[in-house]
């Protein structure tokens, strides 16, 4: 699929990103895991691609460069134990559906922390009117970033008021956020680059400046303009794309959905015991306490 990429702060990894930058597309699934499990997830993605499209791989010289992204979960997970294995990622791929994904403490988000509350996987979406048609834009985040005093919700500095249940020693940014923006709008790779950059505004609304130790990496892709692999296609390609002058509502949809997805990740999360330091608990945000701040 055609794609674009942006890194607000590059202290992280997203495999396949160099080719997205150069060619404007990627092939295969997207996996998001913890920092030390990128290799295991990558192996699973390659195996899944080869097994799923065996005829193409056996009869052509093809190579796999799947997209695998990561954030650091070493506070809540024994990250150095390398407990995520290729078979776990394979099971996730085999069980993938078109149903709305679970949020909070699921998948790669199981061990993530967001603004010193329990973070994880979050989603949000918007409908966008463009060119006389209704299109969809969806966002998935793995939210693992920010310090408590930074947190803002709808522009309100709620983190400064929610000062209880902080993790001991958690006084520096050491997380990251991965943002995936998917749309059926027909967009060129250059337009998808620009769309990916708007995730910066979405997470910025939540309060983060993109800390030095944070890997804030954003990928946008379009399911329009279906394409075959270059090795299996003819000499010419044609594409339909949205007029640049109609992009503003698309940008706003992305900004709003990214902001909402981060909040949804926190609201869906559950309390989780810490691994380092042991004996503490990372609390989920108290939705009722948050609501009272807006009363």
Describe these PLM feature segments.
Residues 1-295:
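Alpha/propeptide regions of enzymes that mature by internal proteolysis
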